[in-house]
């Protein structure tokens, strides 16, 4: 069995919100509420100290074996204002900036597939880190 979850960890907020993005304030928030709440909490955090990361954790369990965990991390920064590239259900896409690519996560997902494949995100990185283990399971079954 394979399961995964993803969270956003903001350095200046001690790793908040983690996997509780949607219920960060204790109730189910809209995308706009999440963006506003994040930017309000970060309003006094100076540039250069606005680091954050998306973290995906894959959990793999087979039969009675212990659970194996695999991380994928995508580092970036939280902008002071959201950019227009938005997608319903992805509140951090317009404010999560990827300095090495000079674009937000929302802009990244608008790029051609070849570009996206060449620049794996947290989800792809988690899967890539699990591949050797998955291959070993396949070999053991053969």
PLM features: residue spans?
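Anionic-ligand binding patches
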Residues: 1-142
């Amino acid at each position: 069995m394979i399961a995964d979850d993803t969270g956003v960890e903001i350095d200046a907020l001690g790793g908040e919100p983690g996997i509780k993005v949607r219920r960060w304030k204790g109730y189910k928030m809209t995308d706009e509420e999440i963006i506003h709440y994040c930017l309000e909490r970060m309003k006094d955090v100076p540039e250069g100290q606005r680091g954050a990361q998306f973290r995906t954790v894959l959990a793999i369990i087979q039969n009675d074996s212990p659970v194996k965990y695999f991380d994928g991390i995508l580092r970036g920064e939280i902008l002071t204002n959201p950019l227009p590239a938005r997608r319903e259900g992805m509140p951090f896409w317009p404010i999560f900036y990827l300095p090495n690519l000079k674009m937000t996560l929302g802009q990244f997902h608008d790029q051609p597939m070849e570009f996206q494949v060449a620049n794996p995100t947290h989800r792809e990185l988690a899967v890539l880190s699990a591949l050797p283990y998955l291959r070993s399971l396949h070999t053991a079954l053969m």
